[in-house]
Amino acid sequence: MKITVGVPAYNEEKNIAGIIQNLTEISDTVIVCDDGSTDNTAKIAEKMGAIVITHERNLGYGGAIRSLFLKARELESDMLVTLDSDGQHRISDVLPVVEPILKNQADLVIGSRFLTENQEDMPKYRKIGIKMITSLANSSIEDTVSDSQSGFRAYGKNILSEITPSENGMGVSNEILMKVSKKGFKIAEVPIIVSYEGDTSTQNPISHGASVTLSTLKFISIDHPLKFYGLPGLVFLAIGLVFTVMTIQGFTETRQILLGTAVIGVGTIIFGTVLLMTSIILYSIVNLIREKN
């Protein structure tokens, strides 16, 4: 079986050599996607013998993952393992991550940071954010997971051939997860240990979390338009009808129009109708596209 390891990298000249050196001991093919780095990441990776994909500008984590998928497909790899380039993942965890695919027990394996108790050093804000985003992802997939944001994953050949990520940002992890679930592929998790020593993430956790959340909601709205738009639409319609009845009753009793109540009633009815129409139109479009495909 041809196992390829892919590493998305952005300005990781300090870590990339050691990571590649350790990976070449367990894999014949290591791909590094240099995502518009301004340092010597690409040169060092080439010198260490990795296949290097170079982005002229920084596309984002999702853009790098997409390039790794396409390159692994081009190389006719049987499996793609992805891990981060910041040195936080243990190379020794690669074998446990690929094992379920080797045993035909899964098509996607996620290295989860929450299946082991040795994660006390994970920043609390990160732990809370990851769990919230994971809960959101779990609301739209069949096999629930504990760590939807882990970059340490293994993808089987079926996934490589049938799924191409489209997100450029960090939302790609949930995008892939939802697409994998929708196609009926099997998802498994194994415990991994991550070191947060010297964690130098420059991303604002709030903007990062908001970006991933919005991306996830976008895919949920496309996959489940009736639930996402239709149910809130019905709720707003019901609220609008209640306020409309209150307006009519008030006018009957006092011969005066309760302006505030009337505005709320009309506004919520209009908004609810728009949501319902959106759900029906989007549902029809999505089904039409699926039938053509």
Roles of regions detected by a PLM:
Residues 168-293:
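Hydrophobic helical membrane-anchoring modules
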Residues 2-4:
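Cell-envelope/extracellular polymer assembly enzymes that use nucleotide-activated donors
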Residues 14-18, 39-48:
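Acidic helix N-cap motif at the loop->helix transition within catalytic regions
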Residues 9, 33-35, 55:
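Conserved sequence signature across two-component system core domains
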